[in-house]
Design a protein with these regions (language model features):
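Active-site lid/adjacent beta-loop-alpha segment flanking the redox-cofactor pocket in flavoenzymes
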Residues: 2-92
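C-terminal lid/capping helical subdomain adjacent to the catalytic/cofactor pocket in oxidative enzymes
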Residues: 89-147
Length: 147
């Protein structure tokens, strides 16, 4: 018999070396790798699949058997934080980037927050209550002052 996983939380290793979460009636797992690569149509690497399976199985009682595999490009800001806001030097350009390996988890909140910022409204109360501010998301925080 299968496990009742629908209500399981996102589970992530303390060192961020793997994670899994319920998704569409199955578990979505990842080795949480951050390999630098040029933009391209990335494909799942057999080594990454095996590494993710090994890490999850070593830390849990799960026996991982993939039914599908996929890969994707992820963007990371230099400070590791999410980026959402108007570019201070490119009028009309709005950044929504830096979701790294957390895009699946952060997309609903980032979508709501960035929609508000684009429309010139304050961040939704449920985001502001948790301390999120436009300044924390702003791409301006990443600008390096000229020397």
């Amino acid at each position: 018999a299968g496990l009742a996983i629908a209500d399981w939380p996102l589970v992530i290793a303390a060192d961020h070396s793997w994670y899994f979460k319920p998704d569409a009636g199955q578990l979505l797992g990842s080795p949480a790798n951050e390999d630098a690569t040029e933009p391209q149509d990335v494909q799942p690497e057999e080594l990454d699949i095996a590494l993710g399976m090994h890490r999850i199985e070593a830390a849990t009682t799960l026996a991982v058997r993939p039914t599908r595999t996929w890969a994707g490009l992820r963007s990371f800001a230099p400070d590791g934080g999410l980026v959402g806001g108007w570019d201070p030097e490119a009028p009309g350009f709005f950044w929504l980037a830096g979701q790294g390996g957390y895009g699946i988890q952060t997309a609903p909140a980032m979508g709501a927050g960035c929609a508000a910022l684009i429309q010139g409204r304050p961040l939704p109360d449920e985001l502001a209550r948790h301390g999120l501010t436009p300044a924390l998301l702003s791409p301006a925080r990443l600008r390096v002052a000229p020397r």
